[in-house]
Amino acid sequence: MEVRPKESWNHADFVHCEDTESVPGKPSVNADEEVGGPQICRVCGDKATGYHFNVMTCEGCKGFFRRAMKRNARLRCPFRKGACEITRKTRRQCQACRLRKCLESGMKKEMIMSDEAVEERRALIKRKKSERTGTQPLGVQGLTEEQRMMIRELMDAQMKTFDTTFSHFKNFRLPGVLSSGCELPESLQAPSREEAAKWSQVRKDLCSLKVSLQLRGEDGSVWNYKPPADSGGKEIFSLLPHMADMSTYMFKGIISFAKVISYFRDLPIEDQISLLKGAAFELCQLRFNTVFNAETGTWECGRLSYCLEDTAGGFQQLLLEPMLKFHYMLKKLQLHEEEYVLMQAISLFSPDRPGVLQHRVVDQLQEQFAITLKSYIECNRPQPAHRFLFLKIMAMLTELRSINAQHTQRLLRIQDIHPFATPLMQELFGITGS
């Protein structure tokens, strides 16, 4: 079959054979459906599938042209100095002449869509196809009524128990010079080898977590606390009472949050206690992330601001301190409030916490919250950029679980040297003695 000259093309040919990538909004049509029978590729003579980048071509030449243009390849003819005949059999032998033939045929680089645009285009076509067939996936149809009620209950619990302005956090201790009553134990003034080893580990724990604090008064005054440069003695404990007060305030909110949730109240009291003991720290960090400013590396808790001091220098600190890295990575996901509360629920209802009796019930509840989170993401974030968001969130929860274990060990070591935990902290973390 001969190739029709360009002058013989009519308007109908162009309208009905446009390529998906070349003209947004109009699907490509198979060349066999054209009036007049099958068409051939203007580049190599193979069977054409439609208009691609302004020219009737086969799928092979379409893909070749896209790849060559995206690579900005500089091709040279190894045979006849740019005069190779391009056919179906020879098209793979000389890329330079094949590209020349594509351009001479009228294929246009500017009609190539970006990878992101192609993904969005495919998603749109898939969505429209689903609408026509009436077989939409759950995420597109929307959440079930049960899932919507579940999210509403969690959001209501969050609103009732978490004040992001921290206006009720008033009765707290501020760091200062420790009184004589807080001197180091006599055993550490002349420590044994065992006590010296404990002291060394505690210093390591605290020195890696130097926290600066800023308090803004209602009259506009500002009070700053900076950790001492040389933490060789008792001054490294100066901020512990304040941090214990803040932690206790947050833990009380977490307990109230859990008690508002009907699924939690339906569990035996023994399981409620076990779940709270295991998840309190994790839920606390998820709430802290909502007030974390990634640009300044600061937790903005109303009039109080906390910042981890950079003891390692530059970006290294981000790698050395898992807690800080976690907050940066989670904040980068730009989660909705609904996604935060669902994360809290998934963390709270973990069936493998020590002491949990009704493993199966708790496991089913956790699965329901996880499925609801996945459905919420599919419904509210259809863009291709968010297709892995659910997996990223679940990975962050796994990382938080690991940080929780490290935090508990660190807290117990510090408590052993310098008791500072409040009664509620002692109860949650299983601290039996002072």
Curated annotation (Swiss-Prot):
Location within or outside the cell: Nucleus
Domain of life: Eukaryota
Alphabetical list of InterPro entries matching this protein: NHR-like_dom_sf (IPR035500), Nucl_hrmn_rcpt_lig-bd (IPR000536), Nuclear_hormone_rcpt_NR1 (IPR050234), Nuclear_hrmn_rcpt (IPR001723), Znf_hrmn_rcpt (IPR001628), Znf_NHR/GATA (IPR013088)
Keyword annotations of the record: Activator, DNA-binding, Metal-binding, Nucleus, Receptor, Transcription, Transcription regulation, Zinc, Zinc-finger
UniProt cross-references to Gene3D superfamilies, sorted A to Z: Erythroid Transcription Factor GATA-1, subunit A (3.30.50.10), Retinoid X Receptor (1.10.565.10)
Motif Bipartite nuclear localization signal: positions: 66-92
One GO term (biological process): intracellular receptor signaling pathway
GO cellular component term, pick one: nucleus
Keyword DNA damage among record annotations: no
MF-aspect GO terms: DNA-binding transcription activator activity, RNA polymerase II-specific; DNA-binding transcription factor activity, RNA polymerase II-specific; nuclear receptor activity; nuclear receptor binding; RNA polymerase II cis-regulatory region sequence-specific DNA binding; RNA polymerase II transcription regulatory region sequence-specific DNA binding; sequence-specific double-stranded DNA binding; zinc ion binding
Regions recorded as binding DNA: 38-107
Ranges of residues in domain NR LBD: 146-433
Zinc finger annotations (NR C4-type) as residue ranges: 41-61, 77-102
Region annotation (Hinge) ranges: 108-145
Tissue distribution of the protein: Expressed in liver, colon and small intestine.
Binding site for hyperforin: S247, Q285, L286, R287, F288, H407
SMART domains in the record: HOLI, ZnF_C4
SUBUNIT field: Heterodimer with RXR. Interacts with NCOA1. Interacts (via domain NR LBD) with CRY1 and CRY2 in a ligand-dependent manner.
Function: Nuclear receptor that binds and is activated by variety of endogenous and xenobiotic compounds. Transcription factor that activates the transcription of multiple genes involved in the metabolism and secretion of potentially harmful xenobiotics, drugs and endogenous compounds. Activated by the antibiotic rifampicin and various plant metabolites, such as hyperforin, guggulipid, colupulone, and isoflavones. Response to specific ligands is species-specific. Activated by naturally occurring steroids, such as pregnenolone and progesterone.
Family label: Belongs to the nuclear hormone receptor family. NR1 subfamily.
Protein name per the record: Nuclear receptor subfamily 1 group I member 2
Originating species: Homo sapiens
Organism placement in taxonomy: Eukaryota, Metazoa, Chordata, Craniata, Vertebrata
